[in-house]
């Protein structure tokens, strides 16, 4: 193991362990993080983080935040996080379909923005499940 990953939400420490590799969804695309990565502070988009430990991948849906990478320490502050293996597939699929419909029916700018955010969150939860299946 080469990286120390710590993921924190407002109400709890979500993850705190050594990892081999991390793949993050940033506002400018996905980035991979390995040992001795260049120091970086980046905004995280709503999406999935992939974490490799002992050659096995774990996924988690992250609902936006920030990541700081420095000296093999990765600290992630998120609004909310959910491990892929803890998400109910049926619930996630239903929520995804509902948010798709809401997005299509949105009329005002505010409704469109709110519907897009809800859709991105639902999509991230569904992707976190499908990546581990």
Swiss-Prot record:
Its main location: plastid. It is a peripheral membrane protein. One of its GO terms (molecular function) is ATP binding. It comes from the Eukaryota. Keywords: ATP synthesis, CF(1), Chloroplast, Hydrogen ion transport, Ion transport, Membrane, Plastid, Thylakoid, Transport. It is found in: Plastid, Chloroplast thylakoid membrane. InterPro entries: ATP_synth_F1_dsu/esu (IPR001469), ATP_synth_F1_dsu/esu_N (IPR020546), ATP_synth_F1_esu_C (IPR020547), ATPsynth_dsu/esu_N (IPR036771). GO terms for cellular component: chloroplast thylakoid membrane; proton-transporting ATP synthase complex. PANTHER family: ATP SYNTHASE DELTA/EPSILON CHAIN, ATP SYNTHASE EPSILON CHAIN, CHLOROPLASTIC. F-type ATPases have 2 components, CF(1) - the catalytic core - and CF(0) - the membrane proton channel. CF(1) has five subunits: alpha(3), beta(3), gamma(1), delta(1), epsilon(1). CF(0) has three main subunits: a, b and c. Belongs to the ATPase epsilon chain family. Produces ATP from ADP in the presence of a proton gradient across the membrane. This is ATP synthase epsilon chain, chloroplastic. It comes from Chara vulgaris (Common stonewort).
